[in-house]
From Swiss-Prot:
Annotated region (Thioesterase), positions in chain: 1066-1293
Catalyzed reactions per annotation: 3 2,3-dihydroxybenzoate + 3 L-serine + 6 ATP = enterobactin + 6 AMP + 6 diphosphate + 4 H(+); holo-[peptidyl-carrier protein] + L-serine + ATP = L-seryl-[peptidyl-carrier protein] + AMP + diphosphate
Protein name per UniProt: Enterobactin synthase component F
Cofactor: binding comment: Binds 1 phosphopantetheine covalently.
UniProt keyword list: ATP-binding, Cytoplasm, Enterobactin biosynthesis, Ligase, Multifunctional enzyme, Nucleotide-binding, Phosphopantetheine, Phosphoprotein, Transferase
Region (Elongation/condensation): 1-301
Domain Carrier: 971-1046
GO cellular component: cytoplasm; cytosol; enterobactin synthetase complex; plasma membrane
Source organism per UniProt: Escherichia coli (strain K12)
GO terms (BP aspect): amino acid activation for nonribosomal peptide biosynthetic process; enterobactin biosynthetic process
Domain of life assignment: Bacteria
Modification after translation (UniProt): 4'-phosphopantetheine is transferred from CoA to a specific serine of apo-EntF by EntD. Holo-EntF so formed is then acylated with seryl-AMP.
């Protein structure tokens, strides 16, 4: 046997990626060479065998020993002659050949699959046409050595054709490469390279992607879109000729880099660049995988030319080539992260100058790529050819890109080359990436011009009041005014304001609770020609004082109890108003003008001082007239006023109804925060139109049951959402509960409430593919622009900055001309007009709607858990004596950073007092507030947070915490605990003396868990798996598993108690269906809040309750005993599916008989046994329909195991289903005097069956949720997307 060699260069990354991936053949590389001409196929087949034998990596074997992976050359391995397949008589030889090759690539071709890692075929598709198929595992070859092997085989074939002896192998033994690599790792060159890449990493800009989806750390897919672009029309050749001082490869790279940057709307981004890592090395003529993908920081200046960019990139690459031997994975590890945690770069660039040409006499050879390994995001292979033309192959991850989008992107690249060919001096920032017709398309989307009357709010309301003077207009719990009465009150108050000195153009502050008087005050202010300034009395006094100082209103309208709060505001005149005034007629005063300010609303400011936004009359008139046209109100409508008046959404609530003859009803103060109060409010007044902020809609939906939804929402005709991104799933839940049309509106305070709209119901909702509903289309006389950093429009699908134009823009910021000028800028596309930058990132969708993509944030994932670092920061900052706080994800234990996900959360704190913080106590407080995966494993106190040169937090400069073992608690016991603690110590590099020490909290990770499991397996003479380390990561817990009886360990998951999730709050008990197992309830973990524990109660065999019980009552009694062992007293939370629901209902009745509280009883398509025909109808023949349904449930459960069902499990399931039929033949229900929640599968509901009637003798109160599914699907993940949130909301009440 040859020498055992470690994996080197690209091999460790490939090995680990394949181990962590579920893809069966992702790391296969394959191509076929199309041979046209006369081919001696038997001779070529023998040449293949001879050529393969000359490349030693093709005879590599791999083994894993004690957590380490080794390779060696198997000298005994021989290659069989490749099969010769003749398809000439086939109807479709080409298609059949392609199918054969793809079938080979679809096999499980992992390195441990037992399939050959090297495979060739010769497929004849015509008399003089052959497909020479070649496939290798990526551990053996890379993109450089693959064609080199093909050329050597062709060389051998041609040599033999000439009758000459076999040429010698040109390939260097891979052992030489390994030895050279190991020497490099110990050399000064390695140290220099490490320092170089550490500096490069610090300066590296964030990665970018052409896909709108977040760029993950590890999501490589072998499902790849391939697009080949041939630039043979001479434009690239013409450009290269004009720029003769620039190498063609450099020019191609600059074009690709600019194309990516403009389509990502990022002028600074990180891409990957493939280096051969062979020059001056033994690897130059070796066949192993040594190519290296290293991060390339791309910086594009808008004012530079393409040759300038090409020259700069070439110089950058020249410097990087001196350090190209350094592993990309090591760069990540050096930065305290692990490969796959987060992306180092986005798209990968590859300049292919490899020689793919085969020189075979009288035979033309063309290579066609089939597989090159998985693609994380996007790869661009650039092929400048000898004729001066350029080919580009684009490989895209199908999970992130679709073919039409990719083709559009390719068209933009062609257009880019054409523009530079026409004008080589064109600046990078001036190149156009919009396709022909897209400017017209965007112009059409923004063609919103509608002529509106030159009028004001007060004029519109007076006009409507004249039409319907006696119609009900305004009401609260105490008062009801008709339109005439309302106008009389408005005019009387407006005259009083004028008496108090209010003049047209002034502002009047309003600090009133929600009532009819708040509405009357706002209307009176407008009637007097002034602007209203709403003050939220829930704000601190200092903040209100700042707003009054900035606005300097001529009057404050408030109440007697609020007036003392404003006593220290100088020169403030006030009016207390809380009762109707004596009418003085209703004739309009006509003091308000279209150019007047209508209202001033203060928003938060980056400086800490709020800023007042001034919105004009014409702006809000446009908004209201559009809304009435788009969502018309009539005299039959009732609009709810429940939005706080300091939130600009309230503006349309206060005025829209009164221009349409509708009625406005005022909710009680603070009622908008109480979903139950809103239910009562909607029902009492018959509300037809209302608004929710999405977060409040979620709370309201959570408060609804089907019954309360019918009672409180029956009159709702249209519901509006704005203020936050609107989750699509929430809309679907609302639609299912109420059926009331939901509409998504978007707009900042700086643009008269809302500037865009999108239906969030029906067909439009069904077509939403993202997580939130699009913000949609512009309203009347309003434009939406999405621009890049150079203020150029971006094409559909490309993210950019959202700007607003048109009539609804605010007049500016009160008393802040500097801020107004910086945010309301000149519109470059409409001379003389203004444009407002929202700060939101958005993109155009194919249907012309705008999709909101959010802003920059600190969201990340660690081992699949999504984490908002900002949320942790805010909780930490609220801790005692903490002035500043920031959370960072990093690898704590550098010695353990050998791959896999090694990151942990670290919290950095700055003390307010400067005294030492009790970090243990603070960490305990965090645990009371945050879910476990968001609690930092270490809190580190710093004198100050590190800042970058531009004054921002420098996360890369945050120090790694010093690795220390936990302060000793209980010492490990002799035996397994001592052995495990010693293994922890040796692998983690710290002295572990605590039985509760956690492997992962001390810096362990999934890759190191493999080594730990291997080491412990040797030491305890029993197999220990990495999975056991994952679920039992402390010394004590792992010892318990290892010391357990072998049969008990083997049967984990097959016992009566199935712990599905452990929390620190109440427990939901889930009862098995007829299968006897509760595994299907694991889906609940996705939906229940973290504090909930979930336990399944099962009936295993032998000797389970279903097998041993004479009747179903005995099963209930047995499970009741099990339940009481787990939880002696209530409240109890029970859930069951099918037969499990029958058991849960019976146990609930028994618990109530014992005086216990049953807080929740959930039934998943469960029916009383009395409603099913279980009795013998004929000679021992049960109801065939019932038996058929039981059989379908059994088959669905077995199918869900995806072929993993063992003989023992199969026998258990079959036996349990037989027992279920036996037990149900004599079953009877027991009355339960509580409330149950029933989910009904509508598709298999028996004709004429009523759940209300069926359960009324046995359950006192029943909530019913009907699901569009069959009985066997009600427990499926798809159905649980609807059921899960309902269960969560019900449990949380």
């Amino acid at each position: 046997m040859s020498q055992h060699l470690p994996l080197v260069a690209a091999q460790p990354g490939i090995w680990m990626a394949e181990k962590l991936s579920e893809l069966p053949s992702a790391w296969s590389v394959a191509h076929y060479v199309e041979l046209t001409g006369e081919v001696d196929s038997p001779l070529l087949a023998r040449a293949v065998v001879a050529g393969l034998a000359q490349a030693d990596t093709l005879r590599m074997r791999f083994t894993e020993d004690n957590g380490e992976v080794w390779q060696w050359v198997d000298d005994a391995l021989t290659f069989e002659l490749p099969e010769i397949i003749d398809l000439r008589t086939n109807i479709d030889p080409h298609g059949t050949a392609q199918a054969l090759m793809q079938a080979d690539l679809q096999q499980d071709l992992r390195v441990d699959s037992g399939k050959p890692l090297v495979f060739h075929q010769l497929i004849q598709v015509a008399d003089n046409r052959w497909y020479w198929y070649q496939r290798y595992h990526h551990l053996l070859v890379d993109g450089f050595s693959f064609p080199a092997i093909t050329r050597q085989i062709a060389n051998i074939y041609c040599t033999w054709l000439r009758g000459e002896p076999t040429p010698a192998s040109p390939f260097t033994p891979f052992a030489d490469v390994v030895e050279e690599y190991q020497q490099y790792r110990e050399s000064e060159a390695w140290q220099r390279d490490a320092a170089f890449w550490a500096e490069q990493r610090r300066q590296l800009p964030p990665p970018a992607s052409l896909s709108p989806a977040p760029l993950p750390g590890r999501s490589a897919s072998a499902d790849i879109l391939r697009l080949k672009l041939e630039f043979t029309d001479g434009e690239f050749r013409q450009l290269a000729t004009q720029l003769s001082g620039v190498q063609r490869t450099d020019l191609a790279l600059a074009l690709a880099a600019l194309w990516l940057g403009r389509l990502c709307n990022r002028m600074d981004y990180a891409a990957g660049f493939i280096f051969m890592r062979r020059l001056g090395s033994a690897a130059l003529t070796a066949t192993g995988p040594v190519l290296n993908v290293l991060p390339l920081g791309i910086h594009i200046a808008a004012q530079e030319t393409l040759p300038e960019l090409a020259t700069r990139l070439a110089a950058q690459l020249k410097k990087m080539r001196r350090h190209q031997r350094y592993d990309a994975e090591q760069i990540v590890r050096d930065s305290g992260r692990a490969a796959g945690d987060e992306p180092l770069f986005g798209p990968v660039l590859n300049i292919k100058v490899f020689d793919y040409q085969l020189d075979i006499p009288d035979v033309q050879a063309q290579t066609h790529t089939l597989a090159t390994g998985p693609v994380n995001d996007l790869e661009l292979a650039l092929f400048p050819d000898v004729h001066g033309d350029l080919s580009i192959e684009i490989l895209a991850n199908k999970q992130r890109y679709d073919e039409p989008t990719l083709i559009q992107h390719a068209e933009r690249l062609k257009m880019l080359i054409a523009q530079f060919a026409a004008d080589p001096a064109l600046l990078c920032g001036d190149v156009d990436i919009m396709l022909p017709g897209e400017y017209a398309q965007l112009a059409q989307l923004n063609a919103t011009q509608v002529e509106i009357p030159e009028t004001t709010l007060s004029a519109l309301v007076a006009e409507q009041a004249a039409k319907t003077p006696d119609a009900p207009a305004l009401a609260d719990a105490r008062y009801l005014f008709s339109y005439r009465e309302m106008r009389e009150q408005v005019v009387a108050l407006a005259n009083l304001l004028r008496e108090r000195g209010v003049k047209p153009g002034d502002s009047v502050a309003v600090a009133l609770p929600r009532s009819v008087f708040l509405t009357l005050a706002l209307h009176a202010i407008v009637e007097a020609g002034a602007a209203w300034l709403p003050l939220d009395t829930g704000y601190p006094d200092d903040r209100l004082k700042m707003m009054l100082e900035d606005a300097r209103p001529s009057l404050l309208i408030t109440t007697d109890d609020q007036l003392p709060r404003f006593s220290d505001v100088p020169n403030l005149t006030s009016l207390c108003y809380n009762a109707p005034l004596t009418p003085q007629g209703s004739a309009p005063l006509q003091l308000s003008q279209p150019h007047h300010t209508a209202y001033i609303i203060f928003t938060s400011g980056s400086t800490g001082r709020p800023k007042g936004v001034m919105v004009g009359q014409t702006a809000i008139v446009n908004r209201l007239l559009w809304m009435q046209n788009h969502y018309p109100l009539t005299g039959e409508d009732v609009v709810a006023q429940k939005t706080p008046c300091s939130f600009d959404v309230s503006v349309w609530e206060f005025f829209w109804p009164f221009i349409a003859g509708a009625k406005l009803v005022m909710a009680e103060p603070e009622a908008h925060r109480d979903p139950l109060a809103m239910q009562q409010f909607f029902a009492e007044y018959g509300v037809t139109t209302t608004h929710f902020v999405p977060s409040m809609l979620a709370a309201f939906v959570a408060s609804l049951t089907p019954q309360t939804a019918r009672q409180s929402c029956a009159t709702l005709k249209q519901v509006f959402c704005s203020g936050e991104a609107l989750p699509a799933d929430l809309c679907r839940e609302w639609q299912q509960l109420t059926g009331a049309p939901l509409h998504n509106l978007y707009g900042p305070t700086e643009a008269a409430v809302d500037v865009s709209w999108y239906p969030a119901f029906g067909e439009e909702l069904a077509q939403v593919r993202g997580s939130s509903v699009p913000i949609g289309y512009p309203v009347w006389n309003t434009g939406l622009r999405i621009l890049d950093a150079m203020m150029h429009p971006v094409p559909p699908g490309v993210a950019g900055d959202l700007y607003l134009t048109g009539i609804q823009l605010a007049q500016g910021y009160l008393g802040r001309p500097d801020l107004t000028a910086s945010r309301f800028i000149a519109d470059p596309f409409a001379p003389g007009e203004r444009m407002y930058r929202t700060g939101d990132v958005a993109r155009w969708l194919d249907n012309g709607a705008v999709e909101y993509l959010g802003r920059s944030d600190d969201q990340l994932k660690i081992r699949g858990q999504r984490i908002e670092l900002g949320e942790i920061d805010r909780v930490m900052q609220a801790l005692p004596d903490v002035e500043q706080a920031v959370t960072h994800a990093c690898v704590i234990n550098q010695a353990a950073a050998t791959g896999g996900d090694a990151r942990q959360l670290v919290g950095y704190l700055v003390s307010q007092s400067g005294l030492p913080l009790d970090t243990s106590a603070l960490q305990a407080q965090l645990r009371e507030t945050l879910p476990p995966h968001m609690v930092p494993v270490v809190l580190l106190q710093l004198p100050q947070l590190p800042l970058s040169a531009n004054g921002k937090l420098d996360r890369k400069a945050l120090p790694l915490p010093e690795l220390k073992a936990q302060a000793p608690g209980r010492a490990p016991k002799a035996g397994s605990e001592t052995i495990i603690a010693a293994a922890f110590s040796s692998l983690l590099g710290c002295d572990v003396q605590d039985a509760d020490a956690d492997f992962f909290a001390l810096g362990g990770h999934s890759l190191l868990a493999m080594k730990l499991a291997a080491q412990l397996s040797r030491q305890v003479a029993r197999q220990v798996t990495p999975g056991q380390v994952m679920v039992a990561s402390t010394v004590a817990k792992l010892a318990t598993i290892i010391d357990a009886e072998e049969d008990s360990t083997r049967r984990m998951g097959f016992e009566t108690i199935l712990p599905l999730r452990e929390g620190n709050g109440p427990t939901l008990f889930c009862f098995h269906p007829a299968s006897g197992f509760a595994w299907q309830f694991s889906v609940l973990s996705r939906y229940l809040d973290p504090q909930w524990s979930i336990i399944g109660i099962q009936s295993p065999r032998p000797n389970g309750p279903m097998q041993t019980a004479a009747n179903l009552d005995e099963v209930c009694e047995a499970h009741l005993a099990t339940l009481l062992e787990q939880q002696p007293h209530g409240p109890y939370y029970l859930l069951g599916y099918s037969l499990g629901g029958t058991l849960a209902q019976g146990i609930a009745a028994r618990l109530r008989a014992r005086g216990e509280q049953v807080a929740f009883l959930g039934l998943l398509d469960t029916w009383p046994p009395e409603t099913q025909n279980w009795q013998e109808k004929e000679a021992n023949g049960l109801d065939p329909e019932v038996l058929a349904e039981i059989n379908r449930e059994r088959e669905a459960f077995l199918a869900a195991q995806q072929g993993s069902t063992s003989t023992e499990l199969f026998t258990t399931i079959e036996g349990n289903y037989a027992d279920a039929v036996r037990l149900l033949t004599t079953a009877h229900s027991v009355p339960f005097d509580g409330k149950a929640t029933l989910f009904v599968a509508e598709r298999t509901l028996q004709e004429g069956m009523s759940p209300e009637r069926a359960w009324s003798p046995w359950i006192a109160e029943l909530d019913i949720y009907r699901q569009d599914c069959a009985h066997v699907d009600i427990i499926s993940p798809g159905t649980f997307e609807k059921i899960g949130p309902i269960i969560r909301a019900t449990l949380n009440r």
